Amino acid sequence: MALLKVAPSRLLSRALQLASRVQNCTPTVTTARRNFHFTVYGRKDTSAKVSDSISTQYPVVDHEFDAVVVGAGGAGLRAAFGLSEAGFNTACITKLFPTRSHTVAAQGGINAALGNMEDDDWRWHFYDTVKGSDWLGDQDAIHYMTEQAPASVIELENYGMPFSRTEQGKIYQRAFGGQSLKYGKGGQAHRCCCVADRTGHSLLHTLYGRSLRYDTSYFVEYFALDLLMENGECRGVIALCMEDGSIHRFRAKNTVIATGGYGRTFFSCTSAHTSTGDGTAMVTRAGLPCQDLEFVQFHPTGIYGAGCLITEGCRGEGGILINSEGERFMERYAPVAKDLASRDVVSRSMTIEIREGRGCGKDKDHVYLQLHHLPPSQLASRLPGISETAMIFAGVDVTKEPIPVLPTVHYNMGGIPTNYKGQVITHVNGEDRVVPGLYSCGEAASASVHGANRLGANSLLDLVVFGRACALSIAESCKPGEAVPSIKENAGEESVANLDKLRYANGSTRTSEIRINMQKTMQNHAAVFRTGSVLKEGCEKLSVINSSMDDIKTFDRGIVWNTDLVETLELQNLMLCALQTINGAEARKESRGAHAREDYKVRIDEYDFSKPLQGQQKKSFNEHWRKHTLSYVDKKGKVSLEYRPVIDTTLNEDCASVPPAIRSY
């Protein structure tokens, strides 16, 4: 703790000690307060050295790796140990201990056409995912993900993931929303593999356990600040060690961003407080685009008043949504799928019920999820976590009474634009171009397999398929031990200057005050239903709130475990995500998937698919909205938008593309 009061020269001495520790560390490294049972700095990182080129106020340590992964959730772990398994000297930087990552909160399951409950085909899964995306998903990436799904689940089983089982010993698969057989003509599919209702917890711990087999260098509780970019190429990451305030520059030939979503831009969400869009913001500050951030998924069943997630698996097991009249109202909105329609459809239906006065409770501002008609033994075996969560956060015994629920922000379909190999792309002169050295996967990325709306249980699949894809792509294009490109001597100095600016910020507005203003603006102006006037007002309000960042006040001037500073850095990241989200929503004058405009209620494609195509003239690219939004933010907070086409072709003839059609359940 002496670092709080020592002079800059003493800090440099501390940095020398850090570098010495890096060069001489053993498999177990003793830090100031704990023993980690895996290497923190890594045995191979003998090239780490002290630099004073960007700061004399902070210890600065330079590292060199073949690859750096930012984030240690499901996608980050799968990418990291995939790279280490292929022989790459790999670092994994994470602001959380790996098993604290938000993947742990996923409940329902992971989709794969295993066919354990009835005959199934990955092509039917492909069709459902394209339809679920409201035809904004890129079909080459969806083809890749759904075809890889069965092998990915079997791989997890081989890693030791304890899937729920049928009486015959096969992996149990439950029904989930938007899933069908025979291209929508064969009834409800049972495609969701699960570990009761704790699938994300099991997945994360399984991947973490597997990762310990490999010699990955984990830098735990390091906050990634920015990408190190040179001439349009990514050459690594600069990060803050939260434990001692040292700065670390990770120079690498390949960088993978797997930092998760930005759910905390909204006031009510199912996301952890750490879901702050760090990677998305890093890409934005690097001058690269983000894609489709206006598409924010509202999960139909967050606990009323608490926002905690109640898995879609409840409805997959037979749970139903009812209004104040006791009516199973989804039968009116989705006559075939009913309570297992896609999430955007169910969330809008619930909102309409509440608006029209059929909500529950004294304020009629929520609906009920009924489970007590199901056998208690089924609830105990298939939904044990939900039974516990409902009792803790709603005071409800699910065997006797319904759970009060409300649509709650849950997932970000948009993110960092990538191709199906995980390579980050930009769109220049009508063509997609790869950003050399930069990859992304998981919720941080937009491949785009989810398009305008994600199907439940496709997110965990996304993590493992594209985490692995990033590792495979790097292994295809690079070899372990290749020369790592150099960086400028002053690379990262802007990041350190920003860190110092926030650490000593002495304005009049607390970080928490600006954050709550941003979150409530997003909640009130970019919710389930949106209108142009409300979105425009939200854009103007958010611009003012962003300007108030210049008047921010922090209180902790130290560098050791400065949570005030870290929360302010996270607020900067959230603000960049929020600006792009609401401006993209205001500009998109149609309704598609999770983006529902009350002043533009129809989906605007190249053709009107509600009518015969014969005789219709195809709309030009500028006239229709079946295209991806690319958003940029300049240093003053001004958002600019561009657009790129949706990819309608599949990878090969094994799977036919699905042409746009009316989307109904």
From Swiss-Prot:
NCBIfam families: sdhA_forward, sdhA_frdA_Gneg
GO molecular function annotations of the record: electron transfer activity; flavin adenine dinucleotide binding; succinate dehydrogenase (quinone) activity
Protein name, per record: Succinate dehydrogenase [ubiquinone] flavoprotein subunit A, mitochondrial
A GO CC term assigned to this protein in UniProt: respiratory chain complex II (succinate dehydrogenase)
Activity modulation notes: Enol-oxaloacetate inhibits the succinate dehydrogenase activity.
Pathway the protein contributes to: Carbohydrate metabolism; tricarboxylic acid cycle; fumarate from succinate (eukaryal route): step 1/1
Pfam family, one: FAD_binding_2
